[in-house]
Structures are given as C-alpha cells and as structure tokens.
C-alpha cells in the first residue's frame, strides 16, 4: 500500500494534525437508496456497494502566515470494503455561514454519501474560518485553500488507517465554484512543490481561475450574487493587510458596514438582500440594474484601473491559477450561461495549459445553463470521469456478477443518456455491476 507522506522541508503543511473527531452519521444501503430518490439522482451516478459512516473532524493546518490554525472538515468512509480504496477530495463552493460548511451538513451531503457508497473514501475540508474552524475565511485565497485541503488529505489518510481501513494511493480532486478555485489551487500546490501526493485526476468546475482578468471584468455587469465582491475584498485585506486603511476608502456609505455580515451567522442570500436594499433605498438602483461597481468608491476604482501595482490588482493576480502546467489528467467543466463565474475562466485555463501539458486535458461546455443548474451535470460528469480511473474493490455481494457483467447504459460526458451515438465521441459505458468504462465509439 502506498503511504501518503509529505516533505518536511515544505513548511506550509507542517502543522497538519487531526485533534478531534466525532462519528456523526451512518447510512444503510436502504438509506442510500433514499438519498438517490430525494436528490433525484440517476442510478448511473454510482452503484450502491457499501454502507457508509461519516465523521466530523477538527485538524491543525496553516494560516496565510504559516502559523498553525484550527480547521474542520468531514470524512466519509465505505464500510466493509475488502481492499485499499481510492480517495476523493471534494472542495465546496461559496459558503458564508458556518452552518453551510460540509462538516455542519454531513447528513445532507449527497456527494459524500453516494461517492463513499460506490467505493471512495471522501474528504471534505471546510477551509479556514468556516464550520467550527478558527479565524476569518480567506475566500478565494489560493494558498490557504490548498493548505487546508492538503492537510486534511494527509492527516485524514492517517486517521482512516487508524480505524483499520486502507487507501490505495489514488487521489481524485474535484470542486465547484469556489471549490473549482480550491481544486485548481490544490493541484498547483501538489504538483509545483515537493509534496509526496500523486494526483490521479482532477476536475475543477466553474471556478474563478483568472481572478485578475476574467472574474474582475464582471465588476461592471449585473451580478446575481453581489455579496461575492465584498467577500473577496475583506478576505484579501485579512491576508495582505494593504488593500485599504479605512473600509470607507473602498466601499460607499452604508455598503461600508457590510463586514459584520461576514461573521459566519449570515447566508449569502441574506447579504445579497441587504446589498440590494441599500442600493434601492440609498442610491435608487434596483437589483436588476445593480452592479458590484456601484458599491465601490469612484476614486478607489479609478486608481485600481490606472495603477498596475495597485494592491487590490496584485492581490487578485496572486490568486490567479493559470500559471502552471498540470502533470495529471484534468477535466475542466463549466457552462457558458454562467453569470456568477465567467466561462472565460475555463477558456483561459485551458488555453494556458493545453500547449504545454502532456496529460489528458479536456474543457467541457455544459451549454447555456446558469451557475446553479450547471452544478449537478458537472459533478455527475466529474464523478463518471473519475470512475474510469479508479481502482475499486469488488463488493462481496457483486462477485458473482463480475464474470457476467453486461452493458446497461451509455452516457455522454455530462451524464446524459445517449440515444443517438455520434462517431468519434467520448462516452461512458455503465455495466450491470456498477463498473464504468471510458470509450470512444468509432464506426
């Protein structure tokens, strides 16, 4: 069995240590069937092979200065599997309230339950400052996203082994929205530094990989979630400390009181409503015409536009994630109808990587779906992509079927059933025993 190790010369991940854990929930095969039903998941998402148990964990990781800080997360484990299992690390999307973090929603996590039942050991970091973690959440800060994820993988693997389970050395990374950014940050950190983790495949989905260009260009557009901009602003001020001396230098009156709403007790929808209320009542701008730029002091934005060394510009550039070469298979998934995270982020990442990487790299456009609707088809596609690489155990009760498996369905890369099969196109063949083959049909 391959052990997960890390190089002691790389200081960012020195503090990893699980300090407490709690068994939160278990699911029987019948419970998991109910999860499929309640979540409207198609059967081909994954065979229900195992019962599952899930733990909430607290662990030490590093803050932006490299100092130890407590974070929290969740671990889902398939029960009674008979050989070492692959690891799937899920990176969650934008969360403002502590109650929205994975460790606080274990019983409702279809991704964790379904993936573990198929045969993955699933890790989910809350990142810094969310769940029961310490400090302010550094939203879309690549360094601490990556360190929080990597430290949970390292220590989570040791924790899983302490329970008597084994992992097989395969590591799959996927995340959506902010989780796409965190996934890309984790790929970059692992493959650009001397960390002995080997990524089997990754699927960054709908992430803002170009914070300084593709995403920043949306400041002057009507935006479904205006609360994202202050979140980035406050996070980068927390990390770098030089974006402003007084919040009133950046945000117009009334908007400059928003910071208190990012204390972990409010949801993004509540913050959005407050922003739209201020815009309407104070500035006579309705929500259908409001842009993030309407919150920003004119002089601050003018300085940002004219100064190539402006602190906010440099902070955004520091968190761009298209300046490395992926060394493992990667599938970028996004939908061109996304008004929250510009599809141009995925295009820029693909164009930056494609000329140089020698690994499988695919950009999939899910069509004119919005940010929310794109999530399910993207996640299903990522899961099917991983299944073609994963080395699963053969569940005991399926052993008799293995020699007689038969094809039950064919799906495209977004998990949609194929009725008409176009030649020279990638498909997934799902068999009766839950195993998935990746094929190109030629005829």
Language-model segments: residues:
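Alpha/beta-hydrolase active-site loop
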Residues: 139-162
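Accessory cap/linker subdomain of secreted extracellular hydrolases
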Residues: 208-323
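Short beta-strand/loop motif that positions the catalytic acidic residue
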Residues: 326, 331-338
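C-terminal catalytic histidine-bearing segment of alpha/beta-hydrolase fold enzymes
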Residues: 216, 308, 313-314, 340, ...
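Residue-level detector of functionally pivotal "anchor" positions at catalytic/ligand-binding pockets or at interdomain
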Residues: 391-418, 442
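Short alpha-helix in the alpha/beta-hydrolase fold that links the catalytic acid
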Residues: 73, 186, 312, 328-330, ...
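Catalytic-loop region of hydrolases
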Residues: 17-82
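Short, surface-exposed "cap/lid" segments of acyl-processing enzymes
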Residues: 63-72, 76-117, 132
């Amino acid at each position: 069995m391959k052990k997960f190790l890390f190089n002691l010369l790389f200081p960012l991940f020195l503090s990893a240590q699980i300090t407490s854990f709690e068994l939160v929930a278990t699911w029987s095969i019948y419970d998991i069937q109910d999860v499929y039903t309640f979540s409207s998941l198609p059967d081909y998402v994954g065979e229900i092979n195992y019962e599952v148990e899930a733990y909430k964990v607290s662990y030490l990781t590093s803050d932006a200065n490299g100092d130890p800080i407590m974070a929290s997360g969740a671990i889902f484990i398939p029960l009674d599997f008979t050989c070492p299992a692959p690891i799937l690390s899920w990176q969650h999307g934008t969360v403002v309230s502590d109650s929205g973090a994975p460790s606080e929603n274990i019983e409702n996590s279809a991704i964790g339950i379904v993936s573990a039942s198929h045969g993955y050991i699933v890790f989910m970091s809350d990142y810094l400052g969310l769940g029961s973690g310490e400090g302010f959440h550094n939203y879309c800060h690549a360094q601490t996203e990556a360190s929080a994820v990597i430290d949970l993988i390292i220590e989570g693997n040791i924790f899983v082994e302490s329970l008597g389970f084994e992992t097989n050395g395969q590591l799959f990374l996927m995340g959506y929205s902010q989780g796409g950014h965190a996934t890309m940050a984790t790929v970059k950190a692992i493959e650009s530094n001397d960390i002995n983790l080997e990524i089997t495949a990754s699927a960054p989905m709908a992430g803002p990989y170009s914070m300084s260009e593709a995403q920043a260009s949306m400041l002057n557009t009507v935006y479904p979630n205006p609360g994202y901009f202050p979140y980035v602003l406050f996070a980068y001020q927390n990390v770098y400390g030089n974006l402003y001396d007084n919040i009133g230098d950046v945000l117009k009156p009334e908007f400059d009181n928003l910071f208190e709403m990012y204390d972990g007790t409010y949801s993004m929808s509540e913050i959005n409503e407050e922003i739209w209320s201020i815009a309407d009542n104070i500035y006579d701008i309705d929500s259908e015409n409001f842009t993030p730029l309407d919150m920003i002091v004119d002089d601050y934005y003018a300085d940002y536009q004219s100064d190539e060394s402006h602190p906010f510009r440099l902070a955004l550039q520091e968190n761009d994630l298209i300046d490395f070469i992926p060394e493992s298979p990667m599938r970028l998934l996004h939908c061109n109808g996304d008004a929250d995270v510009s599809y141009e982020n995925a295009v820029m990442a693909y164009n930056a990587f494609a000329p140089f990487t020698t690994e499988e790299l695919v950009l999939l456009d899910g069509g004119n779906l919005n940010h929310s609707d794109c999530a399910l088809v993207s996640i299903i596609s990522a899961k099917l992509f991983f299944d073609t690489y994963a080395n699963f155990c053969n569940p005991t009760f399926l052993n008799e079927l293995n020699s007689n498996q038969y094809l039950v369905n064919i799906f495209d890369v977004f998990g949609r059933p194929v009725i008409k099969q176009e030649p020279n196109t990638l498909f997934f063949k799902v068999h009766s025993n839950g195993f998935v083959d990746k094929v190109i049909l030629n005829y």
